[in-house]
Structure formats: C-alpha cells, structure tokens
Amino acid sequence: MKNRLRLLRAERGWTQADLAERLDVSRQAVNALETEKHDPSLGLAYRIAAVFGLAVEDIFDNPFRP
C-alpha cells in the first residue's frame, strides 16, 4: 500500500529505529512498510497515525478511493 511514512519520518529527523521504538515494532518492520513490501494491520495503521498526529487517510493511500 502506498504511504508517506519515509517522508513523514524524514521531516521529523527520525531514523527507522526511532520510529520503530515509538511504534513498538522492529526496524525491519518499519523498513518493510516504507518499501511497501508489507501492509500494516489496522491497529498498527492507527498507532502510526497517532505517532504522526495525522489521520490514517493522510498517511496511507486508499486503493478503493476513486
């Protein structure tokens, strides 16, 4: 799923490890999300949104949105 994770993380000056710690996931999990190799669970998507102070829709593209 297309997302803005790398951009949002870079804007804050965070490393993948920094974001992983905030989300309580591995750095490898953050990398897999940023490179769109894996999609987040619904719970993780909401945690990511909370960490960035944004709505889920502002971070992840909805493939079903026209």
For the regions a protein language model found, what residue spans apply to each?
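Recognition helix of helix-turn-helix/homeodomain-like DNA-binding domains
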Residues: V25-D39
